[in-house]
Amino acid sequence: MSNPSRHLSVDEVSQLVEAHFPQVQEGNGRVSIERLEADETVARMAHDDRVIRPGGTVSGPAMFKLADFAVYAAILGRLGTAGLQAVTTNMTINFLSRPQPADLIARARLMKVGRRLAIAEVKLYSQGSAQIVAHATSTYALPPPALRG
């Protein structure tokens, strides 16, 4: 599973997350992987009234969770089990407009995967809308190549 030339499927990455990081599904805002390709990962956060903040919009922490999850899924898709030890070192998110009361969609793109770092960009949308509601950039620390198997 850790062969970097082979990209994992949605099912394979979902199984890795379920087996090694099940707490991501606890609490508010259930997330899932919709599509996993070499150049883009699409993740979804199902609409959940518990993540709606005063004013009727999705909370910032919920949008951050989805963006971070999408990048992690993209890294797992690229690195396989070797990516399990990857950790967020930085994420900057700009909230651009109010999301609709619907599922949130994240489109993550790995801009660079190096020896020690992965850099990604994420755009968040309300389901059914082309308007970007948030934009994030993220840096992940990767395990040393010797530990990647």
Could you tell me what each predicted segment is?
Residues 29, 39-41, 60, 85-91, ...:
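A generic structural signal for short beta-strands and their flanking turns/coil linkers
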Residues 1-44:
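Non-catalytic linker/capping segments at the edges of enzyme domains
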Residues 2-8, 97-101, 105, 111-149:
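HotDog/MaoC-like acyl-thioester-processing domains
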Residues 74-105, 110:
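Hydrophobic beta-strand-centered segment that forms part of the acyl-chain substrate-binding groove
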Residues 61-81:
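Active-site helix/loop of acyl-thioester processing domains in fatty-acid/polyketide metabolism
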Residues 38, 48-52, 69-72:
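Short, charged/polar surface micro-motifs in flexible loops or helix N-caps
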Residues 47-56, 63:
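A short interface-forming secondary-structure element
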